[in-house]
């Protein structure tokens, strides 16, 4: 499933062509994705201007004129492709030539400038919703989400307080979207390695008895932020389905230290151990038992 860096990469790729553009027409090539598309979907989008493109956790938010927001979730295998058109009179870096549509191109937006924005989703776990602007943060998909890990509200003090009473594993705590929004399996594994913390460690041990941050909490916040920023800069990680909107692969997977490296040597200088894989709450966890305590 695309995590925060992949969704943020898509958001940044959409801005040059979709933000400020008018949707001339929309095609819904099937009535549903994970859930049914909104009633009168094509009619409700035709003629609307996209005022801004934001992100909350793993959700893309397209503000429409008229006081509504289109929520788009990529699900397990969704991707967005831009074809044709030009930005400011010349081809944009996120454009590529228009090609034949595929069987999994389920929604197509035709923009007034000639470009098309296509949502492709082979497994159909994605979703597109249209919600009134003043109800967006109370919508069930977004209500209750924790702070953004790259935002000012996420720091060592917050993380320590949030974990202080948790007796689950540290990895399970970080995957809880109510604690911090947008983190997934890949980047939690990588951040824990950088912070030198075992995924088996109990979450409350990064805080003092009073809920104050320890050095562990401080290291972990820095590691999470660094991993996410580097992944965004690299265009995300392409393991199965993720593509940037110009069709290119992300390449952060080439810098993985632990994820999907079971049995391979740890890359830490002087460490002679190998990367191990365990299963936690039904998900594979990769870590170095020597470097992570």
UniProtKB/Swiss-Prot annotation:
InterPro entries attached to this UniProt entry: DNA_glyclase/AP_lyase_DNA-bd, DNA_glyclase_Znf_dom_DNA_BS, Formamido-pyr_DNA_Glyclase, FPG_cat, MutM-like_N-ter, Ribosomal_uS13-like_H2TH, Znf_DNA_glyclase/AP_lyase, Znf_FPG/IleRS
Keyword terms of this UniProt record: DNA damage, DNA repair, DNA-binding, Glycosidase, Hydrolase, Lyase, Metal-binding, Multifunctional enzyme, Zinc, Zinc-finger
The keyword Hydrolase belongs to this UniProt entry's keyword annotation: yes
Gene3D superfamilies: 1.10.8.50, MutM-like, N-terminal
Renumbered zinc finger spans (FPG-type): 257-293
SUPFAM superfamilies tied to this protein: Glucocorticoid receptor-like (DNA-binding domain) (SSF57716), N-terminal domain of MutM-like DNA repair proteins (SSF81624), S13-like H2TH domain (SSF46946)
Annotated cofactor note: Binds 1 zinc ion per subunit.
GO molecular function ontology, one term from the record: zinc ion binding
Complex formation: Monomer.
Family label: Belongs to the FPG family.
Function text: Involved in base excision repair of DNA damaged by oxidation or by mutagenic agents. Acts as a DNA glycosylase that recognizes and removes damaged bases. Has a preference for oxidized purines, such as 7,8-dihydro-8-oxoguanine (8-oxoG). Has AP (apurinic/apyrimidinic) lyase activity and introduces nicks in the DNA strand. Cleaves the DNA backbone by beta-delta elimination to generate a single-strand break at the site of the removed base with both 3'- and 5'-phosphates.
Protein name: Formamidopyrimidine-DNA glycosylase
